[in-house]
Amino acid sequence: MKGGLGNIMKQAQQLQERLQKTQEELAQVEVQGHAGGNLVEVTMTCRHDVRRVRIDPSLLTDGDQEMLEDLVAAAINDAVRTAEKVSAERMSEVTGGMNIPGMNLPF
């Protein structure tokens, strides 16, 4: 019995190490979000750190600040959804599809 419990604990520790490594890798993975037919593009990590915002120059000459703000927000939301999807897929690979209670993705 003791050997079985020790083996389970060892496997749990290995899983925890793999999860931590995957989280560290995801912090470097970049995803994009787009809005307005790609007139606005947001690049962020799977940790939700925004790295870049690209705005097509044509949006800057038109003077519609509210529309531009809406497009930036939509592009950020698109990037967040993509980051969450990529994170969930990567973590699922590590856990073999098990849903581990209390594990909030991405971090």
Swiss-Prot record:
It holds the Pfam family YbaB_DNA_bd. GO terms for molecular function: DNA binding. It is found in: Cytoplasm, Nucleoid. Keywords: Cytoplasm, DNA-binding. Transmembrane segments: none annotated. It comes from the Bacteria. GO terms for cellular component: bacterial nucleoid; cytosol. InterPro entries: YbaB-like_sf, YbaB/EbfC. Belongs to the YbaB/EbfC family. Homodimer. Binds to DNA and alters its conformation. May be involved in regulation of gene expression, nucleoid organization and DNA protection. This is Nucleoid-associated protein AFE_1920. It comes from Acidithiobacillus ferrooxidans (strain ATCC 23270 / DSM 14882 / CIP 104768 / NCIMB 8455) (Ferrobacillus ferrooxidans (strain ATCC 23270)).
